[in-house]
Every structure is written in C-alpha cells, then in structure tokens.
Amino acid sequence: EVTKPETINYRTLKPEMDGLFCEKIFGPSKDWECHCGKYKRVRHRGIVCERCGVEVTESRVRRHRMGFIKLAAPVSHVWYLKGIPSYVAILLDMPLRDVEQIVYFNCYVVLDPGDHKELKYKQLLTEDEWLEIEDEIYAEESEIENEPVVGIGAEALKQLLEDLNLEEVAEQLREEINGSKGQKRAKLIKRLRVIDNFVATSAR
C-alpha cells in the first residue's frame, strides 16, 4: 500500500519508502541492490533485505509491479464503466446510460424501496423527484414506516454490486437461457460469461 505522496528524497536521490516510487513495493531502482545497500550483486538474488524490506532482483520488475492506495470514498474505474462492453452495466443488468447518470451524480438510484408503493429497486430518480418523495415520507399523514433508501455516485454502485449474489444470479441466468432465443439469449449469455469469470477468480 502506498501511504505517502512523496516520490524521491532530494538529498539521497533515492525513492522514498512507502511513497509513489517505493522500492519495497515496486522493486529495486538498481539491479541486484537493496535500498539500504546491505545486499549488492547478483549472488543475493531473491533475498528480501531484513533492514529495508526490498527484494534483491532486477530493476525491470518496477515496470509491472502494482501498488494500491486506500481512498476515502469509493470510485468507479473507467475501464469497467466505459470499456466495451461495460462490465458494471452488464453485472447490474442496467443500460450504460443509467449507470453513468448514477456515477456522475445526475440521478439517485433506489437501493431499497421500503414501504413506498411507487418505487422499485434500481429505479432512477432526479433530485426533484426524490425531494417530492421525501416530503411525502415526512408528511404528518404519511403511513410509510419502512423508509426507502436511495444512493448516488460510485458509493451507490458499490452497494448495488454488493447486493448481487453471483452464484444465484448465474444459476438463474442458466435457467433463463434454456427458455430464450435470439437477441435476448445472446444478451443473457454475455452477462453469464462476465459473472462466471468473477466467480471463477473469486473477484469481488
């Protein structure tokens, strides 16, 4: 995990530990040499330095090793949202246009309709529509006890994806595929393939 915004130490000109160029995370900046200099030369290949935690290997590993950062709020990755096909839209079985409306804070999405008779799960609402519903919920004569829950942005998408039971959805899709034809069948197969890949790799 990258925990510091620093890149290179201006005095030593070495990458800062836990920073964006950290050798412990991405690998050594010099072939066969750890950060602190305890291990040098190819004969120490594969050793992880007990002082600085850097593996003694070739510097080219820095080209493909990946780090990560923890964000304060969820974000949607453009590859999964805008890629062709859009994996997020396929998983949620929603048009990409609707998914974009949620991500770009143009519309709220219903996460739980509660006792409200006119709302449905995954229904989109404009801000004005949601304000009207809120007035209705909090009116004195309101009979709604179980209040509806709505969300917006990537946080709402995260909740929708967490609500999916991939194994159950896959089983349901297989049954639907057996009884469908043409374009509808092709669409169901495409969704099943994406879900099966997530199940096979245990990705969440």
From Swiss-Prot:
Binding residue positions for Zn(2+): C34, C36, C49, C52
Catalytic activity, reaction form: RNA(n) + a ribonucleoside 5'-triphosphate = RNA(n+1) + diphosphate
Cofactor binding remark: Binds 1 Zn(2+) ion per subunit.
InterPro entries xref list: DNA-dir_RpoC_beta_prime, RNA_pol_Rpb1_1, RNA_pol_Rpb1_clamp_domain
Gene3D superfamilies associated with the record: RNA polymerase II, clamp domain
EC top class named in words: transferase
Disulphide-bridged cysteine pairs: none
Cofactor dependence: Zn(2+)
Protein keywords: DNA-directed RNA polymerase, Metal-binding, Nucleotidyltransferase, Transcription, Transferase, Zinc
Example GO BP: DNA-templated transcription
Segments passing through the bilayer: none
GO MF annotations in UniProt: DNA binding; DNA-directed RNA polymerase activity; metal ion binding
Record-linked Pfam families: RNA_pol_Rpb1_1 (PF04997)
EC number: 2.7.7.6
Domain of life: Bacteria
Annotated GO CC locations: DNA-directed RNA polymerase complex
Function recorded in the entry: DNA-dependent RNA polymerase catalyzes the transcription of DNA into RNA using the four ribonucleoside triphosphates as substrates.
Family to which this protein belongs: Belongs to the RNA polymerase beta' chain family. RpoC1 subfamily.
Subunit comment: In cyanobacteria the RNAP catalytic core is composed of 2 alpha, 1 beta, 1 beta', 1 gamma and 1 omega subunit. When a sigma factor is associated with the core the holoenzyme is formed, which can initiate transcription.
UniProt-listed PANTHER family: DNA-DIRECTED RNA POLYMERASE, DNA-DIRECTED RNA POLYMERASE SUBUNIT BETA
Protein name as it appears in the record: DNA-directed RNA polymerase subunit gamma
Organism, as annotated: Synechococcus sp. (strain WH8103)
